[in-house]
Design a protein with these regions (language model features):
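Bacterial N-terminal signal peptides that target proteins for export
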Residues: 1-12
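Intrinsically disordered, low-complexity peptide-like regions
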Residues: 3, 17, 23-26, 97
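Bacterial N-terminal signal peptides
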Residues: 10-20
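An alpha-helical repeat/solenoid feature that recognizes helix-turn-helix modules
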Residues: 25-41, 52-84, 98-137, 141-348, ...
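Active-site-surrounding "flap" and adjacent substrate/cofactor-binding loops of secreted or lumenal enzymes
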Residues: 89-95
Length: 367
């Protein structure tokens, strides 16, 4: 998602604030009040920037508007009858296609997934109910499973694409697209025992630095974190990370080897997806991801990225951070510096970064 603007940056932050405030037992009174003030300013900013057609910027598609709707509906005083939300829902539904996708011409998976999550918040709207069912089916059809791959041969369980989802019907799968798909299927009530969840777990595990990774366990740093994708692109089946490679000593030979480094936003995305799929909390993959999170706990940057890029994806990182830890359910995280109240820390970081007009802007060039 490279086409994000000021409104989207603000909305990613607002979503995280909503998640933090929804976990009331994780916030003390001071931080609850601080969060409410930030949210009020954010909503005012949104209300003054909605387009006449009900959208908040039509590019790169209706997903941005759906993010706004999701954030607004997290507030107890706002429902689908709110005039801003009602106009936005009308716009989102106008982007529904016959095949079940919801988009404006590009980024079909991202747009459909985020719109499905938003529509799932709406009750007693027949048009939304129809769109939800069709969007679920579309996303499940987009997932790589048995369709022909780039070489024309059917994808099987041992293929690096298996279980993942990419930007479009024939797109190379990655952790980001896949986690948004899982988020949408979870939000719209799909049973976690559905084959779509189970297939996704295969792909997600193959992006993690754990012994259970049966495909790439020897090329990812075995620290429990996640890389971006199992392949570089559809023509290059080498794995890909947005971080970099590092040299470590091989655990068996003791000789130095170059391995792919894991990083923050994808690790929280993978951890969250495991929880949505209802993996056992003591599953070694879940434990490894949780331990990575504790070891690399920070809200100052997207941990694991190179120094020059460490602020890239910061607001995306905040979103996955908040959603994942909210799904985990604990109010604190064990870190090398002791227990941290993650929701309080998140509110502090967002309150400090909020602009006077209620928006947020990342100092780095990429959201």
């Amino acid at each position: 998602m490279h086409l994000m603007n000021r409104s989207v940056l603000m909305l990613l932050s607002m979503l995280v604030l909503s998640i933090a405030t929804s976990a009331a037992n994780a916030l003390d009174d001071e931080h609850w009040d601080k969060a409410q003030k930030c949210i009020a300013k954010a909503i005012t900013f949104l209300q003054t920037t909605q387009a006449d057609d009900g959208s908040w910027t039509s590019q790169p598609g209706p997903a941005i508007t759906a993010l706004v709707v999701n954030g607004m509906l997290d507030q107890p005083e706002i429902d689908a009858t709110d005039p801003y939300v009602a106009r936005a829902l009308k716009y989102i539904l106008s982007q529904c296609k016959e095949d079940g996708s919801i988009h404006g011409g590009i980024l079909q998976n991202y747009n459909t997934s985020i719109c499905l999550s938003a529509l799932s918040r709406v009750n007693n709207m027949p048009q939304a109910a129809t769109a939800i069912a069709k969007a679920q089916a579309y996303l499940k059809g987009m997932q790589w499973k048995d369709q022909p791959g780039p070489d024309g041969k059917p994808i099987t369980t041992n293929h690096p694409f298996y279980g993942g989802s990419g930007y479009g019907k024939h797109g190379r799968p990655d952790m980001s697209n896949t986690q948004f798909m899982i988020q949408a299927l979870h939000d719209s009530g799909l049973n976690c025992n559905d084959p779509a969840f189970q297939r996704a777990m295969v792909f997600i595990t193959r992006c993690q630095g754990v012994a259970q990774n049966d495909l790439l366990g020897d090329v990812i740093v075995p620290d429990g974190g996640f890389i971006y994708a199992t392949t570089t692109d559809k023509d290059n089946l080498e794995p890909s990370t947005k971080s970099d490679s590092i040299t470590v000593d091989d655990k068996d030979t003791g000789k130095p080897v170059s391995l792919l480094r894991t990083y923050g936003s994808m690790t929280y995305a993978g951890f969250k997806s495991y929880l949505y799929a209802n993996l056992d909390r003591n599953d070694p993959r879940v434990t490894a991801a949780r331990e990575w999170i504790g070891k690399h706990y920070t809200l100052d940057c997207n941990p694991g990225l190179p120094e020059a890029q460490k602020l890239q994806g910061l607001f995306y990182y905040y979103m996955t951070f908040g959603r994942a830890l909210n799904a985990w359910g604990a109010t604190t995280i064990d870190t090398p510096d002791g227990e941290r109240d993650w929701a309080n820390d998140l509110v502090d970081a967002l309150a400090k970064a909020q602009q006077k007009d209620g928006s947020w802007v990342n100092a780095a060039s990429r959201w």
